[in-house]
Amino acid sequence: MKNQFLASIGLFAASAFSQAVIDSGTGFGTYYYDIEQVEACGTSFDNQNLGFVECNFFTGLSLDQINSNYLVAMNHTQIAGNLADYCGKRVIVTANGVQSDLPLFIGDGCQRCGTGSKTNTVWNPNGAPGLDFSYSVLSELNSNACFAGHIDISWEIVDETLYDFDTNAPGQPTGPVNQRRSVNQRSERATRRRR
């Protein structure tokens, strides 16, 4: 009886901390920018880093301005259909059977990721389902990223906001959610101390 009770508590705790899955899939991971390694794998990311991301549609925000290698691009058609559903949401990626704990978040659209069959298991540079990453992140997911140019992945986009864009948090400052919460929490503690 005691073991059943403990098992029930464990299941309850696990479900309480899991987030709802918004989207999931399998396909290919590629890279298209890098903030930290602007020159990597025989590529210069200078121009890509200046491009505006799809999720900050109203005010324009470049990859350089976001200043994070954790931004991920997903199927352009899907994200364009409802920016608020996907922008800033956490992405959990699995490569080589290992689930990443990197704080990845959706921030851009990927044209290649929205074409090709979702059931296709053969790489096609003109259209294959998947996600687009920074070079640094893709290299961390798989050390063959530079040599191969793409890796096999699976992913889940979960209902946890890691970054606020003008499309998913209108009227709020753009930026990492946890950083802003930390600032707000420090401000609240300072206010309480003054009372």
What residue spans do the PLM features occupy?
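Classical eukaryotic N-terminal signal peptides for Sec-dependent ER targeting/secretion
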Residues: 1-10
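Secreted/periplasmic proteins
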Residues: 10, 15-195
